[in-house]
């Protein structure tokens, strides 16, 4: 293919077409040719950085290190993103070792690279909480909520944070501050879980006060759920009503044929019913 060497943008265009076709070796050649013709072509620099990033972070970092200051400035977002990825991996390794304070220090560096990031703030807060710096963790999440009051990601992250620290009612109240039309599937799933927890908590209290029939009636009014069916099965098993227990476990298995709790429960019921019959 004959290309007019004076027109670096024509070569860049060929690189973009190759990139769109995922023909990365050809895209790399065209972008390199573009840079030989015009070292200031920031689109070619960006194209190469993205190709190398797909291959490995190390290759992308080596490429970035070889650039001139002005070329490097044109892709500072890619450089920040690579740095962020590397810090995230290091922080995760420290979290897995229980080194929470060291992990938090790395999360702070990530937040400096990406200020206001909901999920980095969440991870930093979780690490601080685990490191015993709980008021600092709470303050970070509260400030984030004030900065981004109508951001569904923030609402979901703060809801997760609160519910993870035994503050289910506060989590629900926070979620309800966001108009329902803005709820995403993650928020809806979290709300369902929190409401289900509250219902089960109330039902367990009723049962413990001797009102098992009332507790059971309350659970049966709820939308079908594996947790509720397993609870009803467990209660029936404890009062040796094996027919009811078996029916509740079967309900679970109809929805989730591989549910281990229901399979084990049914086996226990069959053994207990056999002993009773014998």
Name the predicted role of every residue range:
Residues 24, 57-58, 100, 134, ...:
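TPR-repeat structural position
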Residues 2-3, 37, 69-70, 113, ...:
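Structural marker of alpha-solenoid helical repeat scaffolds
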Residues 2, 20, 50-54, 96, ...:
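Register position in tetratricopeptide repeats
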């Amino acid at each position: 293919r004959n290309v007019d060497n004076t027109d670096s943008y024509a070569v860049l265009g060929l690189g973009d077409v190759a990139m769109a076709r995922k023909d990365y070796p050809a895209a790399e050649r065209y972008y390199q040719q573009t840079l030989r013709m015009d070292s200031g072509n920031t689109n070619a620099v960006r194209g190469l950085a993205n190709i190398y990033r797909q291959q490995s972070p190390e290759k992308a970092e080596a490429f970035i290190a070889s650039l001139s200051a002005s070329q490097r400035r044109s892709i500072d977002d890619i450089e920040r993103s690579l740095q962020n990825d590397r810090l995230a991996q290091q922080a995760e390794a420290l979290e897995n070792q229980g080194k929470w304070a060291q992990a938090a220090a790395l999360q702070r560096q990530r937040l400096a690279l990406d200020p206001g990031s909901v999920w980095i703030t969440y991870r930093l807060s979780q690490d601080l909480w685990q490191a015993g710096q709980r008021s600092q963790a709470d303050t970070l999440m509260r400030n984030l909520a004030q900065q981004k009051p109508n951001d569904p990601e923030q609402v979901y992250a703060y809801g997760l944070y609160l519910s993870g620290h035994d503050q289910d009612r506060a989590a629900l109240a926070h979620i309800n501050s966001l108009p329902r039309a803005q709820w995403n599937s993650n928020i809806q799933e979290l709300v369902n879980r929190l409401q289900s927890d509250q219902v089960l908590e109330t039902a367990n209290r009723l049962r413990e006060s001797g009102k098992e029939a009332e507790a059971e009636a309350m659970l049966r009014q709820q939308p079908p759920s594996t947790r509720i069916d397993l609870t009803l099965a467990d209660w029936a098993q404890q009062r040796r009503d094996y027919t009811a227990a078996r029916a509740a476990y079967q309900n679970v298995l109809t929805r989730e044929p591989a549910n281990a709790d229901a399979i084990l429960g049914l086996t226990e019921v069959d053994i207990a019913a056999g002993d009773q019959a014998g």
